[in-house]
Regions:
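Core segments of small alpha/beta cavity-forming domains
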Residues: 41-43, 55-181
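Bacterial N-terminal signal peptides that target proteins for export
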Residues: 1-9
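Core hydrophobic alpha-helical transmembrane segments of single-pass membrane proteins
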Residues: 10-14
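Post-signal peptide N-terminal segment of mature Sec-exported envelope proteins
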Residues: 31-56
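C-terminal motif of bacterial Sec signal peptides marking the signal peptidase cleavage site
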Residues: 18-21
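Surface-exposed, charged secondary-structure patches
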Residues: 149-222
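Short beta-strand edge/turn micro-motifs at domain boundaries
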Residues: 217-262
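Bacterial signal peptide processing site
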Residues: 23-26
Length: 262
C-alpha cells in the first residue's frame, strides 16, 4: 500500500470508534487510580480537547491492486485531551462538562480513547459498573444503516458476551496499567499521574487512514509500552451527507494488550 500526502489545509474530518465485549470472569482489583472509594455523589468533571496542533491535508492511498482512495482535508498531528479526574460511573460520564458546546461524548472523535481508558480503569474496582461504562462509551446500541438494514454496533451486549473475550483480557493484562496512557503514570506512582487534570496525547499520521473511510486509527502513547498503540475509531453517517452522527471505539482489548502482569 502506498500513501501520499497531496496538499494541505481545511476543515476537520471526524471519525469514530467501536467496541467488543466482556464476559463473566471477575477481575481482581489491582489498586491505584486515586481513591478506591467512590465519591458520595456524582460529580460534573471537566474534559478538554486541544486540536491546535493539527494540520489538515489531502491524502491519496494506492493499494497493491491499483485501487485508489482519496481523502480531503484529513487531520494530521497531535491532539491533547484531558480529564479532571477518573469518572467512576455512567452517571459521571453523562454529567461531564464537555468543550465546544457538545452535549454528548460521542460527538467528538478524540474523546473516545480518553473515556474508554477511564471506563477500563473502573475494572480495578467494580466489574459491573465498568461494563456499563464500557458499553456507554462504546455506543452499545442498534440503529438503522443508510440502506435500511439493521446493523449491530460493537459494544452491545457487553454483560452477556462470550466469557472467552473477558478471560483473555484478564489473563494478559493488568487493569491498573491501563492508566499508563496518561502522561506521567508509572509504576512509581501506582500508574496514577501526580497532577490533575490527567493528560493524554493522541496522534494522527499517514497510517491513521486506510481504504475504509469509516475508520481512523488513533495512536496512543503508554509509559509502559515501547511503541505507540493504534486504536480504531469508527464514525457513523446516517444519511451519507458527510456529517457524522456519532463516533465509537473498537475493541477494548486492544488497549489492554501487552499490559501484562510482569
Amino acid at each position: 500500500m502506498k500513501i501520499r500526502v497531496i496538499a494541505g489545509l481545511a476543515s476537520v474530518a471526524l471519525a469514530a470508534i467501536a467496541l467488543t465485549s466482556c464476559g463473566d470472569d471477575e477481575p481482581s482489583p489491582k489498586g491505584g487510580g486515586g481513591d478506591n472509594d467512590k465519591p458520595a455523589a456524582a460529580r460534573s468533571l471537566t474534559v478538554t480537547v486541544d486540536e491546535s496542533q493539527l494540520t489538515y491535508e489531502n491524502l491519496e492511498i494506492v493499494l497493491s491492486n491499483g485501487a485508489t482512495y482519496k481523502y480531503e482535508n484529513v487531520p494530521f498531528g497531535t491532539v491533547t485531551v484531558t480529564v479532571e479526574d477518573f469518572p467512576r460511573s455512567v452517571e459521571e460520564l453523562e454529567r461531564l462538562k464537555l468543550p465546544n458546546g457538545m452535549t454528548d461524548i460521542h460527538q467528538n472523535l478524540y474523546l473516545q480513547p480518553l473515556l474508554m481508558v477511564c471506563a477500563l480503569n473502573e475494572l480495578n474496582y467494580d466489574r459491573d459498573v465498568a461494563r456499563a461504562m464500557i458499553d456507554y462509551v462504546g455506543k452499545g446500541v442498534k440503529s438503522q444503516s443508510r440502506d435500511g438494514e439493521l446493523i449491530h454496533y460493537p459494544g452491545e451486549g457487553v454483560s452477556t458476551a462470550d466469557p472467552t473475550e473477558w478471560s483473555q483480557a484478564k489473563q494478559y493484562s493488568r487493569f491498573d496499567k491501563v492508566r499508563s496512557y496518561f502522561e506521567g503514570a508509572t509504576s512509581g506512582n501506582n500508574y496514577t499521574p501526580a497532577t490533575k487534570p490527567y493528560v493524554m496525547k493522541l496522534e494522527l499520521n499517514n497510517y491513521s487512514y486506510t481504504a475504509d473511510k469509516d475508520c481512523v486509527q488513533v495512536w496512543l502513547t503508554s509509559t509502559q509500552l515501547a511503541s505507540k498503540k493504534p486504536l480504531q475509531v469508527w464514525k457513523y453517517d446516517s444519511d451519507g451527507d458527510g456529517s457524522y452522527d456519532y463516533f465509537w471505539t473498537s475493541t477494548f482489548r486492544s488497549l489492554l494488550h501487552s499490559l501484562a502482569e510482569y
